[in-house]
Amino acid sequence: VYACYADWGIKLKKAWQQYRRLVVVSAFGGVCALVLAGWLMFVLKPDSACGRLFMWKIACRAVAEQPLLGYGMGGFAAAYGNAQEAYFATGDYELWEERVAGSPEYAFNEYLQTAVELGGPLTLCLLAVVLFCLYIGIKNKRFGICGAVFSLMIFSFSSYPLQLPVFVVTAVCLLLACILRNYRWEWMGLVILAGGIGATRLKNDLCMEQACRNWMNARIFYNAAAYGSVEKEYRLLYPLLKKRAAFLFEYGHILHKQQKPEESIRILMEAMKYSSDPMILNIIGKNHQQTGDYLAAERWLIRSTYRLPGRIYPLSLIHI
């Protein structure tokens, strides 16, 4: 964006005409510096880098399984868990992949996450809208706003900013700012829109914050294994926190410890919609053990070993 603002294109043409050899050497040196910087960053934390690449590989496999419609909003974790489970079940993988595999909630790449949840066509449409807004913004010489959008796009390539409401509101406002004309009423409308969305989110977040506070208080008893005392608290919090995987897992685990396998399985099946954690499969397997259905228990525990082969806990349960 700054290059457009500073007319770097014209300056580079002049430099190419006058100092071709210097331009070639400088370009080669810049490429070498970027490659060296990338290699140094990889060497600094190789497992982290390999884990990120493996995560993207599994996310691509999830997209390939359902490329058109995706798995729905919030469906990334479940889709990722199933795709990783299917990948390791084939047995055709490298040892380093087993070492770096995990149970992520996000893809650490907003483009892949959107493709998994919404499908490829809608992802391309959204990207086209963003590029169109950038084109209009650069044409209107709003380089600062376009630079902010570019920064968010680069950030989105290796993280998950759009999973946080504040970044979603920021992105929408920046894109609208790219295409708005210089009429005061349009900018006032943008301010009112941003304020309205923020106020709505704040109201919802305040209710959720209080529920989470109550959950944290109840979790003290959960961590102390006082399952009988805390079951009622979790039941009361369930309507507000029924889309939080960690809460659902704890609630299902409490029901398992209270010898209520059917209820526990129902809650844990809901947790699987929002999480790829193999511990959910382990507890479901143990619930089937409680009911005497050992074949079903074995199936769930074997699925857990495929989801994260590096874990030995489900193997120990199978041999009990």
State what each model feature region is:
Residues 118-146, 301:
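Hydrophobic transmembrane alpha-helices and their immediate junctions
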Residues 1-6, 145-190:
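Transmembrane alpha-helices of multi-pass inner-membrane enzymes
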Residues 38-54, 195-224:
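Hydrophobic alpha-helical transmembrane segments in integral membrane proteins
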Residues 318-320:
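Conserved small/polar residues in nucleotide/adenosyl-binding loops
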Residues 73-116:
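Interfacial juxtamembrane loops and adjacent helix segments
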Residues 21-40, 184-205:
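Internal/C-terminal transmembrane anchor helices
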